[in-house]
Amino acid sequence: MKEKISIFTLFIFCHLFYSQNTILWKITYPENDKTSYLVGTFHQYGESFVKKYPKIEEYLSKSDAAFFENLTIDTLATNKIINSRKTDNSITKYFTKSQIEKLENYTNKSGLNLYKLTPIELLFKLQQKYTRIICTTVEKNEKNGHFDGFLIKLSDKHNVRKIGFETLEKQLELLNKQYEYFTWKNQRKNILHYFENINSSKPNKNDKENLCGFAEIYKNFDLDYQFDKSSTLKISVTERNTNWINEVIPQLKQKNVFIAVGYMHLMYKDGLINQLRKNGFIVEPEKMN
């Protein structure tokens, strides 16, 4: 009896260990013969990363429909929404004239009006660029430098129907709602850190958020899904997960579906993996190669 228990325990341990070393998950439902897949993306990795793992495109190409966070991975579309707002000069109270000039020049080159960005939006954009350039998640001259955006293009290539969980406007709304406590005053140091390092000849890869560290962890699939913990991001993660699950479950029961969303949405007690399991689906880790 002890031997049986030991073997069973070893099996469970191996299964859990293995499940932490993939971003790709297989979804089946006992009451049908459909097979779907879920991939947890890291938005700032691009085409070259995806192409290292042919299974991703293979499973996407065989799907009846593909779900993404949104279908508008377009800088111009984002800029249009932000630039349509009223001007807010409150940033000038917390940055020097020289810093404002540099930030304004930077955002102008990106087609954005500095005085129409919120603190989290500017910080988020700087962190994205920092991750791509300083953490080198995207190769030089890479055409498709966005994981999800490249998968959307692959959906078109294989004539797979695309569905977006949210609009771009909704995503910006949720981002600002989650971080509404961010101000120019309390984010000044963070904004300057990323801005200065992006423009430095000797950038510091050790940032407060450990962006480069996590990029490396993700690349090596040395992941901890923390299924026994709850997410602290109630609006941008937990609430969105619940909304997405309600939308995708009927499709999973009828079709072969491919779901591509940020890796964090697969994590935690209230992540997509656990929620699918609670709804009777079998969700199993899939080897990357």
Regions found by a protein language model. Name each.
Residues Q44, I73-D74, K170, M264-L266:
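Short, solvent-exposed loop/turn segments at secondary-structure junctions
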Residues M1-W25:
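Bacterial Sec-dependent N-terminal signal peptides
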Residues N21-K86:
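Start-of-domain marker
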Residues S84-Q99:
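A charged helix-plus-loop insertion that forms the helical arch/lid used to bind
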Residues K234, E239-I249, Q254-N289:
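C-terminal soluble interaction/assembly domains
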Residues A65, L112, N159-V160, L276, ...:
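Short aromatic/hydrophobic-glycine micro-motifs
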Residues T78, S98-K253, G271:
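Hydrophobic, often amphipathic alpha-helical segments used for membrane interaction and targeting
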